[in-house]
A protein has these predicted regions:
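Basic, polyanion-binding surface patches
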Residues: 1-144
């Protein structure tokens, strides 16, 4: 299972899914036996990066390679929150803006709404850092 894999390996990947991957991405939310690879149950393919031992999801528009740091038990819903460091970040080049901001909608990255709803984000605007008593300016209108 995912939790034991993280604890045993100390590393894990987080892979954003695109619109074409939502069916298989949703299938991965099922609780498989720990001996079953989710890659064997979907059309998603493994991808390994040089010098990194944990698999990514091939064709994922954003891929994060994370190191386990700590965890906190949350009694209110009987779950564990994992704290991790992002050691490597891979993404499709067209998603990177001039100011090095990653625009997820350019990669057709899917957002999840609840447990079973999927949507495509659309950027409405970006703003400068907010400061008291100073007008807020749009970064998009200023060419960011």
């Amino acid at each position: 299972d995912t939790y034991n894999n993280i604890k045993n390996n100390n590393y894990f990947t987080v892979n954003h899914i695109s619109k074409s991957m939502i069916h298989d991405g949703h299938r991965n939310s099922a609780s498989y036996d720990s001996t079953v690879s989710e890659f064997d149950k979907t059309n998603l393919k493994e991808e390994y990066k040089e010098h990194l031992e944990i698999a990514f999801v091939k064709d994922s528009p954003v891929q994060l390679y994370c190191k386990y740091v700590n965890e906190y038990y949350i009694k209110e819903n009987d779950t564990v929150q994992i704290i991790a460091e992002i050691e490597h970040l891979f993404f499709e080049e067209q998603m990177l803006s001039k100011d090095y901001w990653l625009q997820l909608d350019k990669g057709n990255v899917i957002t999840i709404n609840g447990l079973d709803g999927y949507a495509l984000p659309k950027i409405v605007d970006r703003f400068e850092y907010a400061r008291p008593n100073i007008d807020i300016k749009s970064l998009l209108e200023n060419g960011a």
